[in-house]
């Protein structure tokens, strides 16, 4: 049934997008926070590492890993459902290659906030670096992190759809919007509904997430409230 598989494929695509971006948020926040707070040599090393990861082509890596390793991983249980191992591969690759811009955002926030008076007061009363990083500075840096993470979900969904359309992403019997599109390739004229609905939902989902991200940026940016 086309409707059932489209709905099921949407769940997979959204799970991949959200899970990959959560992984990217964790890695990017940790790297950016440590680099921005400590500065100096630590900052230089972490930023050079970030630049190296940034130069890794995400789609090329997804294609190569999907081609040679996705089928070797057994099915997994996630959120009460069974998925092919290719889902886990895509989540990990997207998550580990999408954190670089988040790290730069977090670093810039920490470089600015660590010199504020409330941080100086926390140091004066003997607060250690860990609580300052995660309890004092991080909550004040959440607005741009939330916005960047929201927009990153849309990018992750598009990346999954791209590699799945090439037949190297999510593998059957697990459905995703990307492999629904490739399965309808031979029926473009005779059964257009097979590709119209997955393609339309990908477009609407990505547009909706981008609108949410823009709205969050406007709502959380204090400069727009002046």
Protein language model features and the residues they cover:
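Short cytosolic juxtamembrane segments of multi-pass membrane proteins
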Residues: 211-226
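Hydrophobic alpha-helical segments of membrane proteins
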Residues: 18, 22, 26, 30, ...
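Transmembrane alpha-helix signature in integral membrane proteins
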Residues: 4-37, 205
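Hydrophobic alpha-helical transmembrane segments
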Residues: 14, 18, 61, 88-92, ...
């Amino acid at each position: 049934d086309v409707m059932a598989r489209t709905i099921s494929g949407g769940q997979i695509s959204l799970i991949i997008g959200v899970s990959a971006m959560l992984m990217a948020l964790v890695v990017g926040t940790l790297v950016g926070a440590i680099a921005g707070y400590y500065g100096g040599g630590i900052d230089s090393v972490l930023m050079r590492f970030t630049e190296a990861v940034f130069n890794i082509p995400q789609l090329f890596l997804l294609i190569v890993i999907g081609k040679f390793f996705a089928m070797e991983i057994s099915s997994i249980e996630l959120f009460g459902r069974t998925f092919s191992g290719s889902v886990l591969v895509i989540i990990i690759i997207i998550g580990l290659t999408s954190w670089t811009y988040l790290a730069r955002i977090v670093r810039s926030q920490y470089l600015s906030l660590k010199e504020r008076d409330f941080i100086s007061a926390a140091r004066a009363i003997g607060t250690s670096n860990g609580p300052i990083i995660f309890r004092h500075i991080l909550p004040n840096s959440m607005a741009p992190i939330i916005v960047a993470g929201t927009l990153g979900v849309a990018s992750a969904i598009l990346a999954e759809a791209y590699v799945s359309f090439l037949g190297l992403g999510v593998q059957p019997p697990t459905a995703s919007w990307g492999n629904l599109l490739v399965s309808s390739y031979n029926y473009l004229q005779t059964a257009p509904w097979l590709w119209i609905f997955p393609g339309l939902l990908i477009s609407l989902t990505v547009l909706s997430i981008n609108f949410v991200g823009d709205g969050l940026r406007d709502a959380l940016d204090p400069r727009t409230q002046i």
